[in-house]
């Protein structure tokens, strides 16, 4: 499908020597706008796209070309319909309104070109630009609606393509970007305390620990974990798990000794006070007997009661995970051996829960071993992926894991500037429902549950839970984003989105990893630290992800009721919880690092006391760290908010986590006579709020008589009257 040229605007009178100045002005206006535009290719000297856009072109291209004084992409089409393709993993476009770029026909001109924005799985709409002019930079702004990509969840980039089947001379492209939609004057946030979607799990607040961490078993680490509310730990750490032999504390290939042993881990898990523990047994180079002996040592000999055990790490990973089996990275071999692990490990301790490695998507990680395919018994479709093959093998043996293990990293940087890192898109991925990419928590959980149901069926599948034992923004080389406030925002947004799914654990990668300069430090990424690090701390330095985790302990804990609030603007996300003590907490994340957003907050089915507590961490605190301000200014800020009602407004600062804690309003009381010597105390409180009945003889000292969970209606308590009991009250105690 084509669209005529008048729908775009062409500045054909501009000379080809002007685009560098004009593009600079374009970038300046982007920074000053209410919401930042998204650069695709900004003419950087490194020869790559930015914000995760990669060179997927099938024309002859040079991403490090110059023409007329501008850094640009040169494009030569030597055969039919070749294109320069700024490709990307599926991303949402709701925040953007138009594709904007400059194009020059070069010394020959006359090339007929068209533009497309493919969506994963759908044919693209072709938008015809016409023929290019000779040595003239033309400026095009194409509405995303004209490309069929407006408000998409799965845009996979944009290409500029020669519209004929003939060879064409070189042309040039620069300044490609997505123009942002204007931010609303007021964002609307709505919280309904009656809209409960699940109960919070205590395993959501954890960290991976690693054998290379020489500071693991120290008071410093114990205090650090307690300060940020850690409830869950995983050991021994990522891909080393498939090389690690617990009895010696060494890894193989090559044989390496490490700073931290399993006894060291036992100490730290014990010292932080009853942590839930996940242990990853060695599948890649280990044996089921070795794993069973580990269970016996931990839970029988040392009485650790470590409940959760994994069989291997990312054993589907042919390019990174150790696997010495005759058929490495094979789901059938894995399930067959895992069944033996399950039997021997549970023979040592029948109370443990054992997990198997899985992936969303029925065709994910196709190993291509001959004959390995399975038909989905519900849909009748043949699939070749890891999880269907694994589950089918388990079913044949009649032996099943207790949980499936999932790891999620939205980005991957192989090295330097050739990166998928993008601050704006990272902060949109966790709650962007996108079944085609399976990059969000909801899609991943639904896919895993569907596979369990389809391939195992019946009560067997419903008894298997889903657990996340690794999560961070980037699985590759660490760059600026890792240690910036953006990763702290992502940590909170990731957990907030995960809370709305059936995933029952969330373990961040990792506690300590170490600074690195091998990742992406492009100027489009926010931040000031000259290194990246997947950990939350190093030496005496705590990164923004540490403070984000620290803040979350005041937002939600195991047993709380997870609510389902709404926001009408994707860059201001909200998550809400009703705590077991009856308080309501609201976490709001401003994902834009340049703009404050005004919001109207409406609370339904909850009446707050007029004074709330606000805790926050964001750019202001991170800047205090950069400027070496007093330590108190670098930590979570706390203020009182005296305007809490069921409908109020608030301005949320850019790049900041803001947490409201609302106490319930006071109960309404009255009394009436009952039988002689007794009276009825009537009160009306709020649903799910525990109220304490107290009595006093002098209004100075009070004695608690009973605690009652209100149903929201009028409640009656019949009390005996005595000379020593003259006063009664019903209060909420935090």
Question: What residues fall within each predicted segment?
Answer:
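Short carbohydrate-recognition loop motifs
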Residues: 60-82
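Extracellular ligand-binding interfaces
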Residues: 76-154, 165-172, 177-178
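Noncatalytic carbohydrate-binding groove/subsite architecture in carbohydrate-active enzymes
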Residues: 331-491, 501
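Aromatic/acidic polysaccharide-binding cleft in carbohydrate-active enzymes
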Residues: 467-556, 560-574, 580
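Carbohydrate-binding surface patches
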Residues: 568-610, 614-617, 655-663, 674-675
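Short, composition-biased motifs enriched in small/polar/acidic residues
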Residues: 665-734
């Amino acid at each position: 499908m084509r669209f005529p040229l008048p729908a775009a605007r062409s500045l054909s009178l501009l000379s080809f020597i002007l685009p560098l100045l004009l593009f600079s002005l374009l970038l300046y206006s982007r920074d000053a706008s209410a919401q930042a535009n998204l650069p695709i290719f900004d003419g950087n000297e490194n020869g790559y796209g930015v914000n995760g856009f990669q060179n997927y072109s099938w024309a002859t291209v040079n991403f490090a070309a110059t023409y007329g004084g501008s850094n640009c992409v040169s494009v030569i089409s030597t055969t039919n319909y070749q294109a320069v393709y700024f490709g990307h993993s599926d991303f949402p476009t709701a925040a953007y309104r138009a594709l904007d770029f400059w194009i020059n026909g070069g010394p020959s001109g006359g090339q007929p070109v068209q533009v497309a924005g493919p969506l994963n799985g759908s044919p693209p709409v072709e938008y015809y630009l016409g023929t290019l002019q000779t040595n003239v930079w033309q400026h095009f702004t194409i509405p995303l609606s004209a490309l069929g990509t407006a408000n998409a969840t799965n845009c996979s980039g944009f290409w500029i393509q020669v519209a004929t089947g003939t060879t064409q001379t070189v042309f040039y492209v620069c300044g490609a970007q997505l123009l942002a939609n204007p931010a609303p004057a007021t964002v609307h946030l709505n919280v309904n305390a009656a809209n409960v979607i699940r109960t919070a799990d205590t395993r959501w607040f954890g960290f991976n620990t690693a054998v290379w961490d020489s500071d693991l078993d120290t008071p410093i680490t114990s205090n650090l974990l307690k300060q940020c509310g850690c409830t869950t730990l995983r050991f021994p750490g990522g891909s080393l798990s498939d090389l690690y032999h617990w009895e010696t504390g060494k890894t193989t290939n090559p044989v390496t000794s490490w700073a931290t042993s399993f006894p060291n881990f036992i100490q730290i898990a014990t010292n932080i006070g009853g942590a839930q523990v996940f242990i990853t047994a060695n599948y890649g180079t280990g044996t089921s007997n070795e794993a069973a002996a580990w269970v016996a040592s931990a839970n029988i000999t040392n009485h650790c009661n470590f409940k959760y055990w994994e069989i291997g790490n990312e054993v589907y990973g042919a390019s990174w995970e150790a696997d010495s089996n005759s058929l490495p990275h094979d789901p059938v071999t894995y399930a067959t051996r895992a069944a033996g692990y399950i039997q021997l490990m549970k023979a040592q301790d029948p109370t443990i829960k054992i997990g198997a490695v899985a992936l969303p998507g029925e065709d994910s990680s196709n190993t291509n071993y001959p004959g390995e395919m399975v038909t989905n018994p519900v849909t009748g479709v043949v699939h070749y992926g890891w999880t269907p093959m694994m589950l089918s093998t388990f079913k044949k043996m009649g032996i099943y894991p207790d949980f499936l293990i999932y790891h999620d990293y939205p980005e991957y940087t192989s090295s330097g500037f050739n990166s998928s890192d993008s601050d704006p898109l990272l902060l949109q991925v966790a709650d962007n429902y996108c079944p085609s990419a399976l990059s969000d928590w909801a899609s991943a959980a639904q896919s895993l549950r569907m596979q369990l149901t389809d391939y195992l069926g019946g009560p067997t599948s419903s008894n298997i839970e889903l657990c996340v034992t690794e999560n961070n923004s980037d699985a590759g080389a660490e760059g600026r984003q890792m240690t910036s406030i953006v990763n702290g925002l992502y940590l909170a947004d990731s957990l907030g989105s995960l809370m709305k799914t059936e995933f029952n654990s969330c373990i961040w990668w990792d506690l300590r990893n170490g600074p690195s300069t091998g990742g992406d430090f492009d100027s489009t990424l926010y931040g000031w630290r000259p290194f990246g690090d997947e950990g939350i701390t190093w030496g005496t330095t705590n990164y923004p992800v540490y403070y984000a985790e620290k803040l979350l302990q005041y937002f939600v804990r195991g047993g709380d009721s997870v609510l389902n609030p709404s926001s009408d603007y994707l860059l201001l996300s909200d998550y809400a919880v009703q705590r077991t003590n009856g308080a309501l907490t609201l976490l709001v994340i401003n994902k834009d690092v340049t703009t404050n957003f005004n919001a109207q907050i409406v609370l339904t089915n909850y009446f707050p006391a007029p004074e709330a507590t606000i805790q926050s961490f964001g750019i202001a605190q991170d800047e205090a760290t950069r400027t070496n301000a007093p330590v108190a200014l670098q930590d979570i800020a706390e203020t009182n908010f005296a305007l809490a009602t069921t409908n109020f407004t608030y301005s949320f600062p850019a790049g900041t986590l803001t947490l409201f804690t609302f106490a319930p309003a006071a109960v309404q009381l009255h009394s009436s006579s009952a039988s002689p010597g007794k009276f009825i105390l009537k009160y009306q409180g709020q649903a799910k709020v525990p109220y304490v009945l107290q009595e006093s003889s002098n209004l100075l000292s009070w004695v608690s008589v009973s605690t009652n969970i209100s149903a929201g209606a009028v409640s009656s308590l019949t009390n005996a009257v005595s000379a020593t009991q003259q006063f009664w009250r019903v209060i909420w105690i935090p």
